[in-house]
Amino acid sequence: MSEVLSVKEKIGYGMGDAASHIIFDNVMLYMMFFYTDIFGIPAGFVGTMFLLARALDAISDPCMGLIADRTRSRWGKFRPWILFGAIPFGIVCVLAYTTPDLSLNGKMVYAAVTYTLLTLLYTVVNIPYCALGGVITNDPTQRISLQSWRFVLATAGGMLSTVLMMPLVNLIGGDDKAFGFQGGIAVLSVVAFLMLAFCFFTTKERIQVPPSTTSMREDLRDIWQNDQWRIVGVLTILNILAVCVRGGTMMYYCTWIMGSPEVFVAFLTTYCVGNLIGSALAKPLTDWKCKVSIFWWTNAALAVVSVAMFFVPMHATVLMFGFIFVIGVLHQLVTPIQWVMMSDTVDYGEWTNGKRLTGISFAGTLFVLKLGLALGGAMIGWMLAGGGYDAAAKTQNSATISIIIGLFTLAPAVCYVLSAIIAKRYYTLKTPFLTKILGELAQGARRNQQEFENLPVSKELKN
C-alpha cells in the first residue's frame, strides 16, 4: 500500500499512544513513590510485586496477540479492542491509586491485585494498538511519518499526565495526598478514554491478512525463529529499562540530591520538552540517513551524556537541567525508530516464512517492554531497600544517596551502551535490504491477486 496517510489519521493514531502514555508514564514515575510514601508499603515488596506481575504477562501478552490476530469484526482486527477496553482500563487505574484503610498485609494484597489488573487491561488495549500501526500502511516512509506523529503525541500525553499530576494532587486533595492521587488519576483517565475513542474513529486497517489457521504454539515458535524480532526485543528491554530506572528515580533524585522536591515538576517538564523535540526530529533525520545508523549513534551519545551526569556536583541545578533536556531529546529520537524497526521485523518474518504475525509479534514486544518496566521498578525498590531508604527520614544515609545517583545516571548509561553495540552488530534490516524485502513481498501479493483473478470459472457459475 502506497496511499499517503492524512494528517487527521496520523493524529488519530498518535492519540491512542498519548492515552496509553498518560497511564504508562504516570505509573512509571509515580507508582513506586505512591506505594512507598503515600500508601505505606515497603519498597522491597513493591519491587518484587512489579517483577512477579510480569510472570502473568508471559501468558496474557501472547494470548492477547493470538486473540487479536484471529479477531474478525466490521471494525477490523485491532480497533475494537482499543475502544471496548478503554472504560475498564480507566476504572482500574483509579482503583490502583486508591488507598483503602487496611492492615499492612491487606494493603499489600490490595496493591498486588489492582496492579495486576492494571497491567492486564493495559495489555488488552495496547497490544491491539501497537499492532494497528503495522496494518495501517506498509510503506516505509509513511511508517516513519506515522510513528513520528505517534511519539510526538505520546510524549505530549505523557507530559500532560506527569507534569499535571502533582498540581492535580494538590488541587484536589490539598493536604490529603492519598485522595489527591485518586482524584488526579481519575481526571487523567477520562482524558485517556476520549483519546482512545478518537483513535478508534479516525484510523483504518488497510493491510488485510488472511485468517490464521495455526496454533499459538506455532505462532510463538515462528516469531522466536525470527532473529531480527529477537534483536529488537532485547533493544526494547534495554530502552525501557533505561527510561524506567531514570524516570522512577527522578522524584527521589530531586528530593534527596538536588535538595528540593518542588523542582520536580520543572525538571520533568524540561525532560518532556526535550522528548517533544526528539520525536519531531526522527522523521527528517531518517530521511537524511539510515534509521539503524541514527539509532545506534544516538544510543552511544546517550551513554556518554549519562556518564557525564554522574560527575555533576550535588545541587548543581542549572547544569542538571541542561543535561536532562539533552537526554530527553536523544532518548525520544530513538523511540519511534525502534517501533518502526519492530514493524520491519514483521515484514521480514513474512518474507522468510510466508506468515504475517502482526498481533503476536507486537504482543511479544509489549511483554518485553513491560518486563523492562518491571525490572526497572524492581531494581529501584530492591536497591533503595538494600541501602536503607527511609521515606520518613529528614536525611538519607550515604549509601542511599550513592544508590540514587547511580540509578539516575550510570544504570541508564549501561543500557544505552549495550543498545548501541547490539544494534550496530546484529540488526541487519538496513534500508537497502528492507527495500528488497518489501519489493519481493509486493510482487508476491500482485502475483497472488493475478492468479485469483485468472481462476477458471465453471459454466454453471457463468449461467
Give names to the regions the model predicted.
Residues 2-463:
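Membrane-embedded alpha-helical bundles of multi-pass transporters/translocases
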